[in-house]
Amino acid sequence: MAIRAVTFDVGSTLLYPSPSVAETFVSSAREYGYDIPVEEAESHIDACWALYYEEYRRDGDFWCHHEGCKHIWYIQYALLCERCGVVAHKDDVVDATYRAFLRGHHWGIYEDVVETLRALQDRGVTLGVISNWDTDLLNILADLGLSRYFADIIPSALVGLRKPNPALFELALERLGVSPGECLHVGDADDADGEGPLAAGMHSLIIDRHAGVHAPGLTVIHDLSHVLDYV
């Protein structure tokens, strides 16, 4: 069956933090009198991700509502404050770091994204976004000029469903007007972007921009333009 639609994850698939989380945290802390080397902040990012995955494994449903999305970032930035000795104005630094990433000016677009989206559109493929993200994703994609490529954008917090729940992918299929066998999903996470769409009967590609290790049975690409080989 021919692919009529392609849906995309966002983080580490289409976008990356720019400036980085560490750079943004350092800049936020500087506003309150802290002079923290970027290298020091960067050395604690792995601990922040470890905290994220601990929370995700415990109950990833924080992605289903605004307060949960906000909380998962707040606790990571609070950990950065703790590790970097930010005591006074800790809440202000956490909030400033969080707010910086609510708009597009703090996100970069991978070099292979726009060309790939245009090529898919030229082939008549309908495009969509399915992402575990708060509703600010709508503003971010609009700020970056990417919204125009997508027929539908579904942040998890907007609909109360999160990947890898097949119900979220089924909702996207309904809104895009295609059957599962006509839709390909592309993202970077094995469970959210591999197992989830496959459980919904869709096709899946995992994009690996960081030379990771993936579960057997998943199809992995290393450049977004390779999506064109599967359409």
Residue ranges and their predicted role:
Residues 1-6, 16, 35, 39, ...:
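Asp-based, Mg2+/Mn2+-dependent phosphohydrolase catalytic module
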Residues 2-111, 123:
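N-terminal helical cap/lid subdomain that shapes the substrate entry/recognition surface
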